Structure formats: structure tokens, C-alpha cells
Amino acid sequence: VLVAGGGAAGMFAAFSAAQNGARVLLMDKNVVGRGGATIMAQMTCASALGEEEPDGPDQHLIDTLEAGRGLCNENLSSLLCENSPKRIRQLEEWKVQWARQDNGKIRQVMAPGHSRKRCVYVDFLKTGAAISAALRNKISRDGAIQRLSNVTLTDLVTHEGDIIGATGFDISTATPVTIEASAVILCLGGMTKMFRRTTAPNNIAGEGL
């Protein structure tokens, strides 16, 4: 399995594929695990854990769709709201140190767009860095995952309607690269580079579109 994009989504996809028996090549145009938007995120992650006050995925979805003002994909939003609590717990098991209340429960705070104290964080504005570090640790210890840095994807290779790999090039040498794969997972982020000002890295350019 080829996973294109070595940010949080790509690292988790690579880990999941390896856990299901696949041999994985995880590639990124930067250093795998050091690029993307997640590592730069400082503040909070929304998850209906209900640690501070009653909450649940259904209310989280209502808030998400209302804040999205018609721009959200409802199916994807529902999937996000339903799965976020288990992912927060999983990251906790992977040593992400969420901020705590005095009673030991995970601290949750209000954030714009939410009707509940729902958002979790790591102290000292290190939420994204802590998540990325935990994921890097998981993939670095998995022998089924090979990492390939400084390679950017340019196209998918197809045969009779099936995707059989991808093409790209090594950024440092401009050498063309062709990768054969039985499956390709695109985790290439958005296209915030189209804006003059953005809080995301300036190389998130929408290559996966």
C-alpha cells in the first residue's frame, strides 16, 4: 500500500494498513512525520468525551453542521464526530498527555462553534506537535512501514480502470520516481497555499485534487 502524505492522516493510515497485514510505503514531499498542518497546530481538538459536561457525537454533529453553514459534508462530519472520542483515547494510550482536571479527567474547554466544553489540548500550545510525535513513534517501530521523504506525487498510474501505483519525483534531485502499489491512499491535505495569509504551512498546495 502506498500512502502519499506523511502528516497525521498519512501516518495513521499507514499504521492502520500495517495493522491489517499490508506492507506500506509512506511518502511525503517533506520529511515524513515533520510536514503537514497537524504538527503546527497549537490549540485544541474537538471530541465529545463528556468529561466536563454531558455531551455526545449527535450534539457534536449538530454544532459542526451549524458552524459549517452548509459547507460541511454531513456523512464525513458524522464519521468525524462519531470516531473522535475513540481516537482521543487511543492517542492517550500512545502517551499524548492531554491536559487534566484536578480529578484526573481530561480537561475540555469551550471553543468557537461549539455549545459544550468539548475541546481537548496539550499544555503549552503543543497539541499538534504531541500528536505528531506519538504517530511518528508508532510508525517508526513498525517494520511493515517503509518511509520515503522528499518525494512529491504527480499522478496516479491506472490499468483497465484500476489504480496500480503512482508517479512523482525526488525534490532534491529532480529524479522521476515510479511506485507500484496494489492500493494508494491520498493524505495530501488541503490547498491553503492559494491564500496569501494562512496559519498552515505554505506548501500545502492541493496536490491530491
Annotate the PLM regions.
Residues V1-L26:
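N-terminal Rossmann-like FAD-binding beta1-loop-alpha1 element of flavoenzymes
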Residues G6-G7, F124, A174, M194-N202:
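Alpha-helix N-cap/helix-initiation motif
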Residues Q19-A22, G33, A46-A48, T199-G206:
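A glycine- and small-aliphatic-rich helix-loop capping segment at beta-alpha/alpha-beta transitions
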Residues K29-S172, C187, K193:
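Conserved N-terminal/central alpha/beta ligand/cofactor-binding core
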